[in-house]
């Protein structure tokens, strides 16, 4: 084994002994040691370039043995309380787990090194003597090592000799690498700093100055000293290895300080403006920086700015002395106000994260908030109460820090009243009704303003009134009606509507000055502006229909003519404007009985008047004849029955001769009588009668007569001798006899006597007388007519006693007729003679018994005139005259024509003709037609009649400028003077309408006609009682086009075209639309339709739409409109909300592009109507046709039919909600009952998170049953991710974001009412009702904010 081995064994034995001693030193009651030994052998090669003068083999390399001693002290035996604090501190100064002590022993000769490492647990044994025991153990180990060294020296003596003796001469000690072996001295010559037999012991300088122990060349100094040679005083904690110890004081390295260099030095020693604490300056107030050299800013600018000269220069978005406050918004302004919204704008910094808008009614109430992104500069607060003043504050928010608010006090407008309608409209009143408000306000103000802004009325009403009847309006006036809500000093926006009062008709209708054929109608004109006045009149009972006149306003009277005398009429008057007609005012009147016409005296005598007149048109039963002298002393009345035929005759008798009578004749009918037809007629003066010669002499003739009975002034006697020189004498009226004297002897005198009164002179009585004796010499014939003759003769002288007159036709002399005459008679009238017959007449004077020779004469009666003249076939320029022929033969007829111009034409008609037509007359002219017969040079008496030619008719009546509702009538005026034209307009569906046009016009515009209607127009002219012939024309109005063609709801590819139908019946419409690019399309639309939606249009294109109505082969004129389709706001919509903003307003299946990428398209069902539309429907249950009890894979990708029941897929939910913030709506229905649940946030995480559900705040009517599932992963029958003991999906036959297990189970079994098995929403129908209809839908949250449909309350 050798010395080396022995040494090793010995050393190990010694160490073991010492450990045993250590164990014995620890009392069992105090500590128990467990020692384990680990021996590690390692080989090292130390080369110190050139230090060794010999090369050694591997076995000469030093051997190092490491001994590790783990001393484990059981805790339960090391727990006394006597451990000193200092010992505890020493033990804990280094490692918190083990105290490690290392020692090394080297065998310099054998190149073996023993390393000893002892591990002791620190604080494992808090015994009172543990520290002391350990210290003693260390000392013993050191002592042991010194003893081993001495022992080794003894064992190594004569190593060379031993080697030589054993024959091992190749072994040379290494001298520990710190010297050279000398065979001469058989020992090592050590290098400087080393000593010992094998140079393995370092040399301690100065022998450690007697202040320590040299161990392995190093001084282990006493506790007060240090240094290589223990000559230096020790510094506290050896300056903590952070400085030099100089004379016991530490000269610390930078940046340390303190007596033991434990403390960090502060920069610049805090510039004298602070205290240094562990290297950090605690600056005085007002200073800052690493060295307190800088002026300090308050709160170090809160980390949101930099300090400059003690002042904080804040980052954008912050303000305040320490930059702790967020900069508030600026310039808060109100951009718009409505009744339920306020639009705000402000200016703010760019760094703002978001804005919080807080608003609350100023009178108190719920404070609500709204948050908007920080890049917004405005917001619209919606769903406010109308008419309230709100305190509004806007905060800027950065990193959840709110700024001071900028505030405003803003009042919402009062709401616009809704539902304005008119219940009752009359001429002067309008009853208005509107819907009430649900909020408090002061009252209403309603105003009626004429469209011309002239005048108007305003009324204020209580707030609980929602209807009002306004009186005192103007008829036919269009009013703008405004209803405004009032609150305090505020006025809401008005709701307006226009209404026109009913046009008033004429009032106070009065019929005056009614005559037999004319009635004068007066009325008070309507106050409204009207197009015309419609006057209708006709017989009561409807006989003959009604005549209608259109009269132009402001006419307020009209003379109705050509009435039937003695008839009961009804007249009504209304006003017309456009198609509106007022109520008619009507009254009845009876025309007067027309007076007899053409009153005339046939013959007259001194005591009688023969009267004749034309009968009245009225059905009079009799006539009342009233007559009296002009003095009116006494009235006489005679009732005369109506004569048969056109005339009635009567004779007034017992009249006063020579007196002028006033005669009035009235027609009498049913106790009523007409105005009288009057005339004055004078009776003849009563002639002195019975003029006789009572005596005669050669120079005188005595006369006697009967006194005239009437009033006269005197008598005038005219006597004319045969010499021809007449003489007159006036005799007072009271005389009845007179004697003419101084006459010529033997002369024949013609003596006549007349009674005179003023200029009136009676018929004369004549007598022939002779001075001396003279018989009747001859007969005088006068007044010869066709049936009578007047015979006169002279007085016989002396006068005869009686006279006998005989006469007979010449060929019938044997049948002479005799007439006895009084002797005083000097004339006689033979009546009843035959026309054109020669009569023989003789006169005999009887004197006593002596009869004179007869005086014979002959006379031929005249030819008789035509009889019964009548007029017929009267036209404007001709008439027909007919008559009965006379009895006597004649040659021809002659008729003169008295023209209005005064010219008299005469024409001859053969005697064989009894009817003749006279032509070339003037229209509307009065003619006197007379007719007599002529034989040779003899003419008969004339028969006469008066006649008016008819008016000539207007000519060339035509209708021009014909439109669907209008036509222009034109004509040529007749030759005669025209007062009015009467136009009668008729069509198949309406009775004739009569229009009165002024006589100076030659055209008339027809309006308000019916489209596509055939009209007949008849027309005649009137002038007084004359009416022209009728002319007529026909025309048809055109087919009217559709009206109000408009384009609305214009989107990118569609437009709604609507119109109002024409008035005429049609078969269909022809609609043509064309674009600017030249494309054109024609559609046939049913007649019942009034709108059509054009689909498939091009975007951003101008379109022209043409529409016309069609009936058979007829088409109306074109009506047109223009519109422009819109463009797509989003070319690749990523959700339904963007489709909606693109103008897609119909619910249905659409394609969305996730994140706007063409490669990520997805078919979805869009709900475009619910709550503003724009929802992606991602689940629907409605009929149970689709099985929802499926596995994980199905729920990931989705299943079902988008038009029916379906699940869109969890992957799709995640991809959609990852695009931004979405909101969720769940609609549920049970029959007519419908509820919804709304959550302002909705997201589904990805597959790695098992599609966890994230939802926001709830609102709605269904109750919040979904928040229970917040944050839960999705579970299916094959993926149980719930927290329940059972598999919820398996138990409840569904798949959901189950927890333990559910409060809503919208994917449960359809129609299953067992507890929790069906489609459940706990807060609405509980767990035992399966909801028959469910839709889950989502849309971007921003859509609600921009649409402003729902107000949300948000917390700070």
UniProtKB/Swiss-Prot annotation:
GO terms for cellular component: cell surface; collagen-containing extracellular matrix; extracellular matrix; extracellular space; glutamatergic synapse; hippocampal mossy fiber to CA3 synapse; membrane raft; perineuronal net. Induction: Transiently increased in dorsal root ganglia 1 day post-dorsal rhizotomy, returning to comparable levels 3 days post-injury. Increased in dorsal root ganglia in response to both sciatic nerve crush and transection injury. Keywords: Cell adhesion, Coiled coil, Disulfide bond, EGF-like domain, Extracellular matrix, Glycoprotein, Phosphoprotein, Proteoglycan, Repeat, Secreted, Sialic acid, Signal. Residues 127-157 form a coiled coil. Glycans are attached at residues 55, 176, 180, 198, 271, 278, 302, 391, 469, 580, 790, 868, 873, 1034, 1044, 1259. Residues 1-31 form the signal peptide. Residues 1127-1342 form the Fibrinogen C-terminal domain. Pfam families: EGF_TEN, EGF_Teneurin, Fibrinogen_C, fn3. The keyword Phosphoprotein applies. Residues 188-199, 204-230, 235-261, 281-292, 293-324 form the EGF-like domain. SMART domains: EGF, FBG, FN3. It is found in: Secreted, Extracellular space, Extracellular matrix. The modification Phosphoserine is found at residue 723. Brain-specific. Expressed in oligodendrocytes and small subsets of neurons (mainly interneurons and motoneurons) of the cerebellum, hippocampus and olfactory bulb. Expressed in dorsal root ganglia. It comes from the Eukaryota. Contains N-linked oligosaccharides, O-linked sialylated structures. Contains O-linked chondroitin sulfate glycosaminoglycans. Contains N-linked oligosaccharides with a sulfated carbohydrate structure type GalNAc-4-SO4 or HNK-1 (SO4-3-GlcUABeta1,3GalBeta1,4GlcNAc). The levels of HNK-1 rise and fall in parallel to those of TNR during postnatal development of the cerebellum. In contrast, levels of GalNAc-4-SO4 are regulated independently from those of TNR, rising late in cerebellar development and continuing into adulthood. One of its GO terms (biological process) is regulation of cell migration. The EGF-like domains mediate interaction with CNTN1. The fibronectin type-III domains 3-5 mediate interaction with BCAN. The fibronectin type-III domains 1-2 and 7-9 mediate interaction with SCN2B. Belongs to the tenascin family. This is Tenascin-R.
């Amino acid at each position: 084994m050798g010395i080396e081995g022995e040494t090793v064994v010995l050393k190990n034995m010694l160490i073991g002994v010492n450990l045993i001693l250590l164990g014995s030193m620890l009392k069992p009651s105090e500590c128990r040691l467990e020692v384990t030994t680990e021996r590690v052998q390692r080989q090292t090669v130390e080369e110190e370039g050139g230090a060794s003068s010999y090369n050694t083999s591997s076995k000469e390399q030093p051997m190092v043995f490491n001994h590790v001693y783990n001393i484990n002290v059981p805790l339960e035996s090391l727990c006394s309380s006597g451990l000193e604090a200092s010992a505890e501190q020493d033990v804990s100064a280094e490692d918190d787990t083990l105290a490690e002590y290392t020692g090394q022993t080297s065998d310099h000769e054998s190149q073996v090194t023993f390393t000893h490492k002892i591990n002791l647990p620190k604080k494992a044994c808090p015994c009172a003597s543990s520290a002391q025991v350990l210290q003693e153990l260390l000392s013993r180990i050191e002592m042991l090592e010194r003893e081993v060294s001495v022992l080794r020296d003894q064992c190594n003596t004569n190593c060379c000799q031993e080697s030589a003796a054993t024959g091992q001469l190749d072994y040379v000690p290494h001298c520990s690498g710190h010297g050279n072996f000398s065979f001469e001295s058989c020992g090592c010559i050590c290098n400087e700093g080393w000593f010992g037999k094998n140079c393995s012991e370092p040399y301690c300088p100065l022998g450690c100055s007697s202040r320590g122990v040299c161990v392995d060349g190093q001084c282990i100094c006493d506790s007060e000293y240090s240094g290589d040679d223990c000559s230096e005083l020790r510094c506290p904690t050896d300056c903590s290895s952070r400085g030099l110890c100089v004379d016991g004081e530490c000269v610390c390295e930078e940046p340390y300080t303190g007596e033991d260099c434990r403390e960090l030095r502060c920069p610049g020693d805090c510039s004298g403006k602070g205290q240094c604490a562990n290297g950090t300056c605690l600056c005085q107030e007002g200073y800052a920086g690493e060295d307190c050299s800088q002026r300090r800013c308050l709160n170090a600018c809160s980390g949101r700015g930099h300090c400059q000269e003690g002042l904080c220069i804040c980052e954008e978005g912050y303000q305040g002395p320490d930059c702790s406050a967020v900069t508030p918004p600026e310039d808060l302004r109100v951009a718009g106000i409505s009744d339920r919204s306020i639009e705000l704008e402000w200016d703010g910094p760019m760094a703002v994260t978001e804005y919080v808008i807080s608003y609350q009614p100023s009178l108190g109430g719920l404070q609500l908030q709204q948050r908007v992104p920080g890049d917004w500069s405005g917001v619209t607060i919606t769903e406010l109460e109308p008419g309230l003043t709100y305190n509004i504050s806007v905060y800027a928010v950065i990193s959840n820090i709110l700024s001071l608010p900028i505030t405003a006090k803003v009042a919402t407008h009062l709401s616009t009243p809704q539902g304005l309608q008119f219940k009752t409209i009359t001429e002067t009143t309008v009853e208005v009704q509107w819907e009430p408000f649900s909020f408090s306000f002061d009252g209403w103000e309603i105003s009626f303003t004429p469209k011309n802004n002239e005048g108007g009325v305003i009324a204020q009403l209580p707030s609980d009134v929602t209807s009002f009847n306004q009186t005192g309006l103007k008829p036919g006036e269009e009013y703008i009606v405004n209803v405004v809500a009032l609150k305090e000093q505020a006025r809401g926006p008005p709701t307006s509507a226009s209404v026109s009062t009913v046009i008033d008709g004429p009032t106070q209708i009065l019929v005056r000055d009614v005559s037999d054929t004319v009635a004068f109608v007066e009325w008070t004109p309507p106050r409204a502006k009207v197009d015309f006045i419609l006057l209708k009149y006709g017989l009561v009972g409807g006989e003959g229909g009604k005549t209608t006149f259109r009269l132009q306003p402001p006419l307020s009277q009209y003379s109705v003519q050509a009435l039937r005398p003695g008839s009961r009429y009804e007249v009504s008057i209304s006003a017309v404007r456009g198609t509106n007609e007022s109520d008619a005012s009507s009254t009845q009147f009876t025309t007067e009985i027309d007076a007899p016409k053409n009153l005339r005296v046939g013959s007259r005598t001194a005591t009688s008047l023969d009267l004749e007149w034309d009968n009245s048109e009225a059905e009079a039963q009799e006539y009342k004849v009233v007559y009296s002298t002009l003095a009116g002393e006494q009235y006489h009345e005679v009732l005369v029955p109506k004569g048969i035929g056109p005339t009635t005759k009567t004779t007034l008798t017992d009249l006063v001769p020579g007196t002028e009578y006033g005669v009035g004749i009235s027609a009498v009918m049913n106790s009523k009588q007409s105005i009288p037809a009057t005339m004055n007629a004078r009776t003849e003066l009563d002639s002195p009668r019975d003029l006789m010669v009572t005596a005669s002499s050669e120079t005188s003739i005595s006369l006697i007569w009967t006194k005239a009975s009437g009033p006269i002034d005197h008598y005038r006697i005219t006597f004319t001798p045969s010499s021809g020189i007449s003489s007159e004498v006036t005799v007072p009226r009271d005389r009845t006899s007179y004697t003419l004297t101084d006459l010529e002897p033997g002369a024949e005198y013609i003596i006549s006597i007349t009674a005179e009164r003023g200029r009136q002179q009676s018929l004369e009585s004549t007598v022939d007388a002779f001075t001396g004796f003279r018989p009747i010499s001859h007969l005088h014939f006068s007044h010869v007519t066709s049936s009578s003759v007047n015979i006169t003769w002279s007085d016989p002288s002396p006068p005869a006693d009686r006279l006998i007159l005989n006469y007979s036709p010449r060929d019938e002399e044997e049948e002479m007729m005799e007439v006895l005459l009084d002797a005083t008679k000097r004339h006689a009238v033979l009546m009843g003679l035959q026309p054109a017959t020669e009569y023989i007449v003789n006169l005999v004077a009887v004197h006593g018994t002596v009869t004179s020779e007869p005086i014979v004469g002959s006379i031929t009666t005249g030819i008789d005139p035509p009889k019964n003249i009548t007029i017929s076939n009267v036209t404007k320029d001709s008439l027909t005259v007919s008559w009965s022929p006379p009895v006597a033969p004649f040659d021809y007829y002659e008729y003169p024509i008295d023209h209005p111009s005064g010219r008299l034409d005469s024409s001859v008609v053969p005697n064989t003709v009894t009817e003749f037509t006279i032509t070339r007359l003037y229209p509307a002219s009065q003619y006197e037609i007379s007719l007599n017969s002529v034989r040779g040079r003899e003419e008969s008496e004339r028969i006469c009649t008066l006649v008016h030619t008819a008016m000539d008719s207007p000519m060339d009546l035509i209708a021009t400028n014909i439109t669907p509702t209008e036509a222009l009538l034109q004509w040529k005026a007749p030759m005669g003077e025209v007062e009015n034209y009467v136009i009668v307009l008729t069509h198949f569906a309406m009775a004739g309408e009569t229009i009165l046009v002024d006589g100076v016009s030659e055209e008339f515009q027809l309006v308000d006609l019916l489209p596509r209607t055939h009209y007949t127009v008849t027309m005649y002219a009137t002038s007084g009682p004359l009416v022209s012939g009728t002319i007529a024309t026909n025309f048809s109005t055109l087919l009217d086009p559709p009206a109000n063609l408009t384009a609305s709801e214009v989107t990118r590819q569609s437009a709604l075209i609507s119109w109002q139908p024409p008035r005429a019946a049609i078969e269909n419409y022809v609609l043509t639309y064309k674009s600017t690019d030249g494309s054109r399309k024609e559609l046939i639309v049913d007649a019942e339709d009034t709108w059509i939606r054009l689909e498939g249009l091009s975007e951003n294109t101008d379109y022209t739409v043409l529409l016309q109505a069609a009936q058979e082969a007829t088409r109306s004129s074109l009506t047109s409109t223009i519109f422009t389709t819109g463009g797509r706001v989003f070319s690749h919509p990523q959700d339904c909300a963007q489709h909606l903003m693109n103008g897609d307003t119909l619910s249905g299946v659409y394609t969305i592009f996730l994140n706007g990428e063409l490669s990520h398209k997805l078919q979805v069902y869009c709900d475009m109507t619910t709550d503003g539309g724009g929802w992606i429907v991602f689940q629907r249950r409605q009929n149970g046709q689709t099985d929802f009890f499926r596995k994980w894979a199905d729920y990931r990708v989705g299943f079902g039919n988008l038009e029916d029941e379906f699940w869109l897929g969890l992957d799709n939910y995640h991809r959609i909600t990852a695009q931004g913030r979405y909101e969720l709506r769940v609609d549920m229905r049970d029959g007519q009952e419908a509820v919804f649940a709304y959550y302002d946030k909705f997201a589904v995480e990805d597959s790695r998170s098992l599609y966890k559900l994230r939802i926001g705040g709830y609102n709605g009517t269904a109750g919040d049953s979904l928040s229970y599932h917040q944050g839960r992963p999705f579970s299916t029958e094959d993926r149980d991710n719930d927290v329940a003991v059972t598999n919820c999906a398996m138990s409840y036959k569904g798949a959901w974001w189950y927890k333990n297990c559910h409060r809503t189970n919208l994917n449960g079994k359809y129609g299953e009412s067992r507890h929790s098995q069906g489609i459940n929403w706990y807060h609405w129908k509980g767990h035992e009702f399966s909801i028959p209809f469910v839709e889950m839908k989502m849309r971007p949250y921003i859509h609600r904010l921009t649409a402003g449909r729902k107000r949300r309350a948000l917390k700070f």
